[in-house]
Amino acid sequence: MVKEIITMDEVKIFTGNSNVPLAESIASYLNMKLSPAIVSRFPDGEIQVRCLESVRGKDVFIIQSTQTPAENLLELLIMIDAVRRASARSISAVIPFFGYARQDRKTKSREPISAKLVANLITTAGATRVISVDLHAAQIQGFFDIPTDNLTAVLILGKYFREKNLENPVVVAPDVGAVQRATTFAQEIPHATQAIFVKKRLSPEEVETSRLIGEVEGKNVILVDDAIHTGNTLISAAKEVLRRGAKEVYATATHGIFAQDSLKNLEESPIKEIVVTDTLPVLSRPNLPEKVKVLSVAPLIAEAIRRILMHESVSELFEKK
């Protein structure tokens, strides 16, 4: 059977307001332009969406991260509904940062599983596929009843640090949940060793680091996590490894959320450099510290979209050659 030939005339890429620069970069890598759409507010504050060209029979990709405020998620849902009602052939929700992902299970009585609720909403709205980057928990893929591609930026971040040629690097997981990610990252850094923090969380905002397993004395530490929220975990870990004789401390994560006063706290912290990606519009943040470096996931997402359209393997993007 001959593969169906996909032309870019059959593809439409839309974006909401959550991260327009990333969406523009993704379209550019595909030699396309974003399809015109109105995504604004009615006078009463409700979300207004209207696609300004036909999507009938087209493969539609909607690029929208779902970070706070909740309007970003609602924009995505309404855009999906709009193109579904306009007879799109397929609708892929491209969600570089998937909000509410930390609420993937009940940790206390009478709590919601918000990640599952959001997955249900996206599916019910009419999405036929989801593409995301470094979900907080890989099992969130199972919350969807449609194909879900969980891309990873670990190779992008790993390449950056590999080219720094740090002497005596040690990759440190700031908590147990980051171990698998740190292990994958360490494989990208020649001669890197590993260490892990075992911590006790006192509350969602307050973290007590209890024990470090591994050797960091005289080494350059790279703290690896999936996202930076308040930064408290990384700052606490950085102070501890320096107390134990580490030379310098770097930190990296896919998603730079930087909640509350985290940027100020991280700027004043002993961390030498913080490397994140543009799944969120970090570069538009006011007073962004010079120590924060932003790498782009646009080529990664664009290549995944191309492979999906050409019916090629997406997982091969992350396989060792």
Locate each region found by the language model.
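PRPP-associated nucleotide enzymes
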Residues: 1-321
